[in-house]
């Protein structure tokens, strides 16, 4: 490859935010494509046709002069639930999509149109098999993301669910076996990548998920945050606890609800220790299958009047909640790499999170927040009491969190690291005479 020519990268994914709606993988791919294009990289985007109304963000990507779009239909099955959410779909339609999308990447590689393939999850299954059968030597980078198909971690692990996901596991492992480099999004995730994908640690490279600080800052509207409080009946003096995420069981929102109930009323039934504990509200941003159960739970626990469920919001409204929050809590039972936590830190919010997935790589206890054992109501309640009682310290913690993001988790930093990984793989292939 000519060192002076731009890199030509195929990005293969089942979804991205601007085309298919929000989600952790979707948002990551969206940011990745935008920052690759901004770096001068030529991108071949292989994914599903757009399912959203065309907007300025979508047009900016699809109409970019350095991007070619290769839509691959996602053939799901009537009556089997929403696309990409049921176990049956994930283990049939998704690998089939990955076979077809990967074959498109293989054709582009064989035609000399791309230098490297960067796949997400099982979306490069077809390319992985082609490399093995046809000796295609265009390098493959694989990001397996959260690896929920392997059953998760800790309390959310389900042996039965893992068994049901066996076909998808095999597809992702085939992609990993063919990859030149497997990405772990955090140092803490490396052992899980090695174990789940049955690979060697030497083949794993840490490239963190990142946030776009310019976007966060552009949405940092103090006035809109005040309006959010006013609209939802939250006074400026109330301590606002924020959580953001899909309302799934593995996010641990039920654990947080029970912990807040303990904060609201001491275990002995006596008056809470701190008067501030009487003056808090919990805002939950997101939607999902556990919404009704959570509404019922907070009412049963006696904190329904303190809790606001916003549903899905626009990016501007989500960032407004970050800006006006006093504390961000992410009680997840399993996590790959939490973009919501990074966004909260980018907005200078102190964080309480659980010791799972990549969260310990982000939240420094006593510096930018607190870490607790997943699923422990008592431990979480104790830390919340501690946080509410240290309002002056929270601002210092929030600023420390912002510094951590600027140093390690901003796209300006991460894209340079990723481009270096690409170039190293291409140089290695050229040295071996493979491309």
Label the model's feature ranges.
Residues 365-366, 370-377, 386-392:
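Conserved acidic donor-binding segment of nucleotide-sugar-dependent glycosyltransferases
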Residues 350-353, 363:
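Short hydrophobic beta-strand element within catalytic cores of glycosyltransferases
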Residues 57-58, 217-234, 269:
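A short helix/loop element that forms part of the nucleotide-sugar donor recognition site in Leloir-type
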Residues 333:
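Aromatic "clamp/platform" in nucleotide-sugar-dependent glycosyltransferases that forms part
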């Amino acid at each position: 490859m000519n060192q002076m020519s731009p890199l030509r990268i195929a990005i293969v994914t089942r979804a991205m935010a601007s085309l298919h709606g929000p989600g952790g993988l979707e948002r990551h791919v969206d940011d990745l494509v935008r920052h690759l294009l901004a770096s001068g990289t030529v991108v071949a985007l292989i994914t599903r046709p757009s399912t959203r109304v065309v907007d300025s963000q979508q047009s900016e990507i699809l109409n970019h002069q350095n991007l070619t779009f290769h839509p691959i239909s996602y053939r799901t099955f009537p009556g089997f639930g929403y696309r990409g959410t049921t176990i049956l779909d994930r283990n049939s339609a998704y690998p089939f999509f990955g076979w077809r999308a990967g074959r498109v990447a293989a054709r582009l590689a064989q035609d000399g149109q791309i230098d490297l393939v960067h796949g997400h999850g099982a979306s490069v299954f077809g390319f992985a098999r082609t490399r093995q059968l046809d000796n295609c030597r265009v390098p493959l980078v694989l990001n397996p993301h959260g690896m929920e198909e392997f059953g998760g971690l800790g309390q959310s692990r389900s042996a039965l669910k893992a068994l049901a996901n066996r076909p998808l596991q095999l597809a992702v492992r085939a992609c990993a076996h063919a990859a030149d480099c497997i990405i772990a999004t955090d140092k803490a995730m490396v052992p899980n990548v090695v174990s789940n994908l049955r690979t060697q640690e030497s083949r794993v490279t840490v490239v963190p998920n990142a946030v776009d600080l310019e976007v966060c800052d552009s949405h940092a509207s103090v006035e809109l945050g005040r309006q959010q409080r006013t609209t939802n009946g939250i006074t400026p003096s109330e301590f606002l606890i924020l959580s953001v995420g899909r309302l799934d069981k593995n996010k641990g929102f039920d654990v947080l609800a029970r912990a807040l109930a303990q904060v609201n009323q001491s275990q002995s039934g006596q008056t809470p220790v701190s008067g501030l504990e009487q003056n808090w509200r919990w805002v939950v941003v997101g939607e999902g299958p556990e919404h009704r159960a959570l509404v019922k739970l907070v009412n049963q626990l006696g904190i329904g009047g303190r809790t606001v469920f916003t549903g899905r919001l626009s990016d501007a409204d989500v960032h407004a909640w970050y800006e006006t929050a006093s504390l961000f809590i992410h009680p997840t039972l399993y996590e790959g790499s939490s973009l919501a936590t990074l966004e909260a830190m980018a907005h200078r919010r102190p964080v309480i999170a659980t010791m799972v997935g990549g969260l310990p790589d982000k939240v420094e206890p006593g510096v930018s927040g607190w870490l607790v054992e997943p699923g422990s109501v008592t431990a979480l309640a104790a830390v919340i009491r501690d946080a509410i009682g240290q309002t002056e310290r929270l601002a210092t913690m929030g600023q420390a969190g912002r510094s951590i993001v600027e140093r390690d988790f901003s796209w300006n930093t991460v894209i340079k690291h990723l481009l270096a990984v690409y170039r190293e793989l291409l140089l290695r292939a050229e040295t071996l005479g493979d491309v």
